[in-house]
Amino acid sequence: MILPNIETFIGCESSFEEASIVLYGAPFDSTTSFRPGARFGPAAMRHESFGLETYSPYQDRDLMDISVFDSGDLELCFGSSEMALSDIQKRAEEILKSDKFPLLLGGEHLVTLAAVRAVAEKYPDLHIIHFDAHADLRDDYLGARLSHACVLRRCHDLLGDGRIHQFCIRSGEREEFRFAAQHTDFHPLSFNGLEEAVRELKEKNVPIYFTIDLDCLDPAVFPGTGTPEAGGVTFLELLEAIRTVAQANVVGADVNELAPMLDASGVSTATACKVLRELLLAIAK
């Protein structure tokens, strides 16, 4: 049973039964390699969302016109990545069994692996569209294979070649970029190639998991993240890319890597809230 959440993201007050989309938070950042704090992202987004309008002038849609249930944050073991991932996967499976769309709030990017495991069980031909500043394709980070620096490599272990589509990547080891060139559909530095990739996936009607690491945004727009990288995209570029991806058969998604305390101005949290609002409205049918 999924209990109601006390503090919800604005406009996400539907009951579980009537909702088509279910938010669930994974406040986990135990493998953070630079600046910690992403565990506080989901709660900050909910709290600060009430400074946001439910209406989007970009899409002429309103959160009050769609059905979203916010199930709150999971209680996760910070001392064990394996236990945390297991708990996240169980929640995602519960949502999927009810034929609802699971939308995960991180947390660091490792949490995506748990969601992908759950979604891939239901959709064995799953593809991933990945927006990020970092390739996240290391085989291990300081000996750990379960790390936010390795999450897409672990997803590749699960899905295989040609089923991960990466955009905006502008940081990583040389070996990661070489691995991507051989094993993923790799589009570094920008969203160039996104429309073509989405068109091909849409024609095949394959299921897509959509993961957004908010550090794909330029740190001038979004400094409140664990590993900021100069040279990112603007908010409007990200919004247009989200709307492009939403045209395809998206069956699960996440937004991750807001570390709110790293931006005392609150701008990063406000930006993350707006990204989530636009994502919800784009994927709602």
Which residue stretches match the model-derived regions?
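Conserved alpha-helical scaffold segments that buttress catalytic/binding sites
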Residues: I2-K285
